[in-house]
Amino acid sequence: MVLAGRQTAGRGRLGRFWISPRGGLYLTVVLRPSAEHLKSLVIIAALAVARAIEGLAGLQTSLKWPNDVLVAGRKIAGILSESELVGENVSHALVGIGVNVNADMAAYPETAPLATSVMTELGREVSREALAARLLNEFETLYLAAQAGKPMDEEWRARLGMLGKEVRVRFGEQVEEGLAEDVDSDGNLILRRADGSRATIAAGDVTLRS
């Protein structure tokens, strides 16, 4: 595991810049899972973050597909999973987790409407060390459960706030619109189009349709 309190070149999905000010919690977990468990890593990380924030700070969280953790509808944490394959085997996987803990989000007006922090929500600082310990304990519990074959998509599904709602999904140059009907055990979004057909989407940017 690699742990940092600040990043100068934080990176999110699709190579996007991730604002990583002092006061946050930024960690990368290095794993060597089997190929069949690779897709579950984002689910595991998202659930671990949500459980840790709720357990330590008492804040109610929700998840935004595919890799964001929200509080009061604003992003409080993001997850990035990358891996390297050698043939059909996983050489290693990196799960990066960034949590806005004691960051003053008002200092970043460009993201303030969309992002929040634990301190912003509580009005006080919390121990980043305690949050990191709780997060890693939850991650280990979930990871070992997944390795033992225990499904966790039901909890993930229950925490996804956009299921059952009309959404727009943008991935690359493509856009799909429809009802966010479900997610499968690999974390793919099942979208039901207006004509009744279904699309299975592995990744993309989701927004609610007005």
What is each model feature region?
Residues 1-92, 111-114, 120-130, 134-137, ...:
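Contiguous, small/hydrophobic- and glycine-enriched helical/loop subdomains that border
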Residues 28-30, 96, 179:
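Residue-level recognition of well-ordered beta-strand positions that form the cores
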Residues 58-60, 154-161, 177-183:
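Short linear motifs in intrinsically disordered
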Residues 93-104:
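Active-site beta-strand/loop microenvironment that shapes enzyme catalytic pockets
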Residues 102-113:
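Cytochrome P450 core scaffold surrounding the K-helix E-X-X-R motif
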Residues 129, 143-170:
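Polybasic "coupling" helices that flank or enter modular domains
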Residues 146, 163-210:
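Conserved RNA-binding domains used in RNP assembly and mRNA/RNA metabolism
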